[in-house]
A protein has these predicted regions:
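Alpha-helical transmembrane segments of multi-pass membrane proteins
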Residues: 11-27
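Alpha-helical transmembrane spans of integral membrane proteins, capturing the lipid-embedded, hydrophobic core
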Residues: 79, 83, 140-148, 180-192
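Juxtamembrane non-transmembrane "cap" segments at the membrane-aqueous interface
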Residues: 142-162
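Membrane-interface transmembrane-helix boundary segments in multi-pass integral membrane proteins
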Residues: 41, 158-193
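Alpha-helical transmembrane segments in multipass membrane proteins, preferentially the mid-helix core
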Residues: 116-132
Length: 208
């Protein structure tokens, strides 16, 4: 049953990412190269790829060099933080900005709701949490920090920003930096909540 759950999650995860890429290419208004750069500029895509890699490693190569990385409890727990932020920001803030239909709507639901729920459920019931430490919260901030830096640098040259709250052209640097500071606070608080929850679960399940 565990392997079936993971296998379904692997299929759904990669299907959604690949389908979104195909749709993005089909509907592109710029060159293929620029389209690919833009596609991989979305935190949603990067986070879902991380989730798909974690699930894939669990299923096929848990003891390989790369498998040990993506099945490590700290990596999975950090990815839980990222995918929860993806789901929360999209469903609370961004969903109202467009109305996808057909395949795009299906992919949209999988990326922002289904995969996050599956991954969080797996973390809650299947991932050991006894190695989690409070300092992990700060390490997990490195990925979103690097992401924001690269998005802002590239946006300076391409004038493309994947999300309205990081759009310097529309809002200016002051507003964007305030938005980013708010996001980092959300990441930090959520990271601490994930670690705290993990410690409680570990304590009451006897992992310690």
């Amino acid at each position: 049953m565990k392997n079936l759950f993971i296998a379904v999650s692997v299929l759904l995860g990669w299907f959604a990412v690949i389908a979104q890429l195909v749709l993005y290419i089909i509907n592109r208004t710029v060159s293929l190269t620029e389209t690919l750069f833009r596609f991989f500029s979305y935190f949603t895509i990067l986070s879902n790829i991380l989730v798909a890699l974690c699930f894939t490693a669990m299923l096929v190569k848990p003891k390989s060099a790369w498998g040990r990385i993506f099945t490590h409890s700290k990596v999975i727990s950090g990815t839980v933080v990222y995918i929860i932020v993806v789901s929360a920001v999209y469903n609370l803030v961004l969903r109202q900005l467009w109305n996808p239909e057909g395949l795009q709507k299906i992919v949209d639901v999988i990326l922002h709701s289904t995969i996050p729920m599956l991954f969080v459920a797996h973390w809650l019931f299947r991932v050991p949490k006894n190695e989690l430490q409070w300092k992990n919260a700060f390490a997990w901030l490195l990925f979103p920090l690097l992401y924001i830096i690269l998005v802002l640098i590239r946006g300076t040259f391409s004038d493309f920003y994947p999300y309205p709250f990081v759009d310097v052209t529309e809002s200016g640097y002051n507003a964007v930096l305030i938005n980013c500071a708010g996001l980092f606070i959300i990441f930090l608080v959520l990271s601490l909540l994930v670690i705290g929850t993990g410690k409680l679960i570990s304590k009451y399940t006897g992992e310690d």
